[in-house]
From Swiss-Prot:
Keyword field: Cell membrane, Membrane, Transmembrane, Transmembrane helix
Keyword Transmembrane helix belongs to the record: yes
Chain segments annotated as transmembrane: 11-31, 143-162
Predominant subcellular localization, coarse grouping: membrane
Keyword Transmembrane helix belongs to the record: yes
Compartments reported by the entry: Cell membrane
Taxonomic placement: Archaea, Methanobacteriati, Methanobacteriota, Methanomada group, Methanococci
Membrane topology, from the record: Multi-pass membrane protein
Annotated protein name in UniProt: Uncharacterized protein MJ1161
GO cellular component: plasma membrane
Length: 167
């Protein structure tokens, strides 16, 4: 009977340790997908005509002529749903991208494809420019500790407690 109580106590300790570790590091391993990456590619040649990463929550427009192709991109985060359209006429492509996007959204018109990915990107901190000096924000640049490190530490301490409880 006494051994059963000890084994139940050990299981409760393990359960509490694992749940505590998961609770404490839940914000560490959750990635924030804060950026949109738009890639315009010529499918027949494999050439990337245009690639840009920009914040997911900000409207964005760009117009460029690259290798005879006119690329006109408009992004508006205020419209919900995965909607983007391609309009083509005489090597002029207009991409209207809006709303919440999924991984690898893809639209093709002729040989030109637009690939839109939602990614995590570390944008540089904003800088304040004055006449003679440049100052930058003092935000932290430390990377989060990986989940595997937390799990390894939890396993190590669990093993230590297990060994101590045997003696």
């Amino acid at each position: 009977m006494r051994d059963n109580i000890r084994s139940i106590n050990k299981l409760l300790i393990y359960l509490v340790l694992i749940l505590s570790a998961m609770f404490l590091c839940q914000n560490v391993f959750a990635e924030d997908y804060n950026a949109i990456e738009i890639t315009v590619k010529n499918i027949s040649s494999g050439e990337i005509l245009y690639q840009k990463i920009f914040p997911k929550d900000e409207a964005f427009s760009d117009y460029q002529v690259i290798n005879g192709f006119t690329i006109d991109i408009h992004y508006n985060p205020n419209y919900p749903g995965m909607v983007y359209k391609v309009h083509q006429s005489n090597n002029h492509f207009i991409f209207n991208v809006s709303g919440e996007l999924n991984w690898g959204s893809y639209q093709q018109s002729g040989d030109i494809a637009c690939i839109v990915d939602v990614i995590h990107y570390d944008f540089p901190p904003p800088s304040n420019t004055t006449s003679n000096t440049t100052t930058t924000s003092s935000s932290s640049t430390k990377a989060p500790i990986p989940l595997s490190v937390y799990l390894a530490i939890t396993a190590f301490f669990t093993y230590i407690i297990y060994r101590k409880s045997k003696t």
